């Protein structure tokens, strides 16, 4: 179905996997279907997902951490060009201040509440 290294639009990702078109952790039937990550907000993608303070975003990240299994991960390479980089699973989720501080410095963001560490499966 998905081909590693191939580019997809968000509409194509939505049609294939379901979930919302604009969030970076789309969900369908209560499960996160994939991750769509930008390097601007997630400079270590696809190995980490940096989670901000929005309650909706935090809830979705917690769902990903709890659901188990693997998800397809896409990294944005250009306008509406999302590269499929493979299937990943959650290695660990951290709200530890040491991890938060490290990734806030790396990303330049100041609103992080959680870091989700992924590993390729």
Question: What are these model-predicted stretches?
Answer:
Residues 1-83:
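Acidic, glycine-rich low-complexity segments with interspersed aromatic residues
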């Amino acid at each position: 179905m998905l081909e590693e290294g191939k580019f997809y639009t968000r509409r194509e990702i939505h049609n294939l996997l379901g979930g919302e078109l604009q969030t970076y952790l789309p969900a369908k039937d209560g499960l996160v279907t994939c991750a769509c990550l930008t390097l601007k907000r997630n400079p270590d993608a696809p190995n980490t997902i940096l989670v901000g303070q929005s309650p909706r975003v935090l809830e979705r990240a917690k769902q990903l951490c709890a659901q188990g299994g693997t998800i397809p991960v896409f990294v944005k390479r250009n306008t509406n060009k999302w590269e499929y980089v493979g299937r990943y699973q959650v290695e660990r989720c951290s709200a530890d201040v040491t991890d938060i501080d490290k990734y806030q410095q790396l990303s330049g963001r100041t609103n992080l509440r959680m870091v989700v560490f992924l590993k390729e499966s």
